[in-house]
């Protein structure tokens, strides 16, 4: 069996990992063995957090809608229920944006939700 020399491929692999670890603190950006661990862990965090980001934004939108709805005398759950009964289909992202930037429109939506609940 012939001898396999890995100089080129090993250097390429090391270079790829060290480039991915650029900007990391200390040995994590300079030493291959440590950099491999750091890059792998970073990938795991990135994968996890891409999913968590969706949850966190939805959570933020709900908190904003709840705060604005309560200023108009309605809880979040009753507000959403009222919108459903009034057959107003606006997603939470847009509702949150309206609540933050356009108080008059949000108040009108709350009034429609209250009317649908009554």
Swiss-Prot record:
The keyword Membrane does not apply. SUPFAM superfamilies: Ribosomal protein L20. GO terms for biological process: ribosomal large subunit assembly; translation. Gene3D superfamilies: 6.10.160.10, Ribosomal protein L20 (1.10.1900.20). It comes from the Bacteria. Disulfide bonds: none annotated. PROSITE patterns: RIBOSOMAL_L20 (PS00937). GO terms for molecular function: rRNA binding; structural constituent of ribosome. It holds the Pfam family Ribosomal_L20. Keywords: Ribonucleoprotein, Ribosomal protein, RNA-binding, rRNA-binding. GO terms for cellular component: ribonucleoprotein complex; ribosome. HAMAP family: Ribosomal_bL20. NCBIfam families: rplT_bact. Binds directly to 23S ribosomal RNA and is necessary for the in vitro assembly process of the 50S ribosomal subunit. It is not involved in the protein synthesizing functions of that subunit. PANTHER family: 39S RIBOSOMAL PROTEIN L20. Belongs to the bacterial ribosomal protein bL20 family. This is Large ribosomal subunit protein bL20. It comes from Tolumonas auensis (strain DSM 9187 / NBRC 110442 / TA 4).
């Amino acid at each position: 069996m012939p001898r396999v020399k890995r100089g080129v491929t090993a250097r390429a692999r090391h270079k790829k990992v060290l480039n991915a670890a650029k900007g990391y603190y200390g040995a994590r950006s300079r030493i291959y063995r440590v950099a491999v661990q750091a890059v792998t862990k970073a990938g795991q965090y990135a994968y996890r957090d891409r999913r968590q980001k969706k949850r966190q934004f939805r959570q933020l939108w709900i908190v904003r809608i709840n705060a604005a709805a309560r200023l108009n005398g309605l809880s979040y759950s009753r507000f959403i229920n009222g919108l459903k009964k009034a057959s107003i289909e606006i997603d939470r992202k847009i509702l949150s944006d309206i609540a933050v930037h356009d108080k008059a429109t949000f108040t009108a939506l709350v009034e429609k939700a209250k009317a649908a609940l009554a």
